[in-house]
Amino acid sequence: KNYDQILSKDNFKPSEFSLDRDYFVLTLHRPINLTDENLKIIFDGISEFTSNYDILIPAHPRLRDYVNRNGIDTSKFKMINPQPYIKFLGLVHNSTLCLTDSGGLQEETTFLNKKCLTLREETERPITVEKGTNKVIGVNKNIISEINDSLNTKLTTYKEIELWDGKTSERIFEDFNDK
């Protein structure tokens, strides 16, 4: 049911976010990326793509506070408030590419079979890399080439990940009942 809501045209209206073309979703919230140095690398790199793509940033309060406090120019991007979960997944599902430092979004892009670049040096979700939807790229001067590589790479067809079948609560319930 939730997956159907994610895909529903009623849930996702590009005009609501002034999206006129294909777009990237960027989420940042980890303190390691909320520094002048790292934000400059990330924003400068992603800015290279604004002539062809909208950059949608559902801004975590920590990112918004940092940007406002430090007067960082985000005029090339569409910074929006955090969205309800299903609507956010609709944005992700309809995007061309996701860039994130969020572990949760790495999983969600894998489930939705969407390309994801992780702006960290490591991931707690290695299965997302193994399945080929996610690439850990860190934050460095190679961000432009990494985005280009991702845009020019076709994803393989999604194969269900063991235990990612929506039946976790049933397994937990059975486990409690067996004890």
Where are these regions (language model features)?
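A conserved nucleotide-sugar
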Residues: F43-A59
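A short acidic/histidine/glycine-rich donor-binding loop in glycosyltransferase catalytic cores
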Residues: L117, G132-I137
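A nucleotide-sugar donor-handling region in carbohydrate enzymes
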Residues: K1-D36, I137
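Structural alpha-helical scaffold elements that stabilize or flank donor/cofactor-binding regions
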Residues: F49, G71-D73, G90-L91
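A donor-sugar binding/catalytic signature common to diverse glycosyltransferases
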Residues: L91-V129
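Conserved active-site histidine-acidic residue motif and adjacent donor-binding/catalytic loop
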Residues: I80-L91
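Nucleotide-activated donor-binding/catalytic signature segment of Leloir-type glycosyltransferases, i.e.
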Residues: D65-P82
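Leloir-type glycosyltransferase catalytic cores
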Residues: N2-S8, K135-K179
